[in-house]
Amino acid sequence: MSKIKIMCTSTGCIDYAPERYKSLGIDIIRIHVFFNGKEYREGFDLDPVEFYRQLETIEDPKNHLPTTGMPDTEEIMECFDRAIADGYDEAIVYVLSSALGGTYNKICLVAKEYENKLKIHVIDTHLTCFGEGLLAIKAAEYAAKGMSAEEILKETRWSMDHQEFIGVDGKLDYLIYNGRLKGGKAFMGQLL
């Protein structure tokens, strides 16, 4: 039976409840946030409370919104190397939607370098935030029960296909300014 390591990008928000992800042994690959002239690793150098506090102080959101960047190659490699050092045979990495940036592709490229060392399954969740994180949590619970990687992937893919999230954003302006909400959708959102 393979020993399976579960990983997730920081956009999965699982570190909002650190005792939960730590008890399940989930590793987090940190996305970078560029804000107010500084670079942070999401959820590590900049916690959510401080992030939102700083966000509220922005005087000109059109020109000063935070931006994100992919994790460093070295950080991804550290996660994979740690899994190998800890005796894992396989890793399943749940990644934020590839439609939102290049993180999925970057992790896939790094994973190819480990083909003979660790069997890595990189999963484009087509989600972000808690939807992504819930998949990693369920996968870690399944791994703890002794399920195989194939069984875990089957269960979490089913969940991906059947998840629906509804979110409320009190300030659609941020989604419009950063280009995530455009055209008619932006117009309709502002009417609501």
Language-model segments: what does each one mean?
Residues 3-5, 10-27, 31-38, 86, ...:
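Mixed-charge interfacial surface used for oligomerization/domain docking
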Residues 38-93, 98-101, 105-106, 112-113:
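Class I S-adenosyl-L-methionine
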